[in-house]
Amino acid sequence: MEQQHIVGVHGIKQGRTSRRELIKDWNKALNRGITALHGQDVVRSDPRLIPTLEIPHWSSLLARGADRLGPSDFFPDDSTALTADEEAFIVEAMDDLLTPQERALAEELDPTTLGLPKLPPSVTRRAMVYDRRTPDSVVGKLITCLREVRFYLKHPNLASKVQEHVVKAFSDDTATVVIGHSLGSVIAYDLIRQEQIAAPGTAVHTFVTCGSPLGIPAVRRAMNIPGPELLAMPAHVKWLNVYDPDDVVTGAAGLALGARNVTDVEVDNGNIDPHAVQAYLRTLPVARAATRSLS
């Protein structure tokens, strides 16, 4: 039995880190979960249980509003106002997540009572309603993620640079688990859908999505996936979706309603940051996927 290999596709807010730091942080979290699953003595006696890991640092490639590569701030941030197109996309996505009653309430609220900076009234009203579900005021993370997902999907030249960079991390002769977190799950799914990775006969055998926004219908529409069409994996790839219902980026739900052959697993990442990649990586479902071929 061979040691498992993982390619991680990271998510948002990684512009100021590095590939080396990402690998260090992911390894630490993965090892914690694997040790919790198998026991410290077993892990010490069989080092093959600790997978090898590669993480292409794609976010270093993107600079906002430019068709160029560079290490500068890459996606829209809290200091930049929403464009009209961003506003429309975020409103569409949040309307997907809100109930009809919540959408009606949003139209009645006074947006001046919520101090969210640089947000237009249409977004602020919906944020106020969504905030009632999540009293810890984490709706800002959802808005940030939606901006970055849209930026990736609506700038094909930049997206192709990201895809080219990520694809280089894969080998057709190394058994591989792909772990995509947040926007990284969208990037990885795009690559699988286009058969740039995980095509028949290649070594990718498992796809793990963590904190994925793929369950939000507006995201799928932006990926040019028609409403009735279900997300899907090639027959030879096992798909595991790990989500925390308190993670707003997931829409507080799994993917089973919008995807075929996916296994949803609910986890509890705690209250500090349910969307944090380290919290997902140290869960037992991810540890099982990371060591499946050895069990």
Protein language model annotation of sequence segments:
Residues 1-59, 63-70, 111-179, 185-295:
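Lipid deacylating catalytic domains
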Residues 44-103:
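N-terminal accessory alpha/beta regions
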Residues 89, 95-122:
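Alpha/beta-hydrolase-fold enzymes
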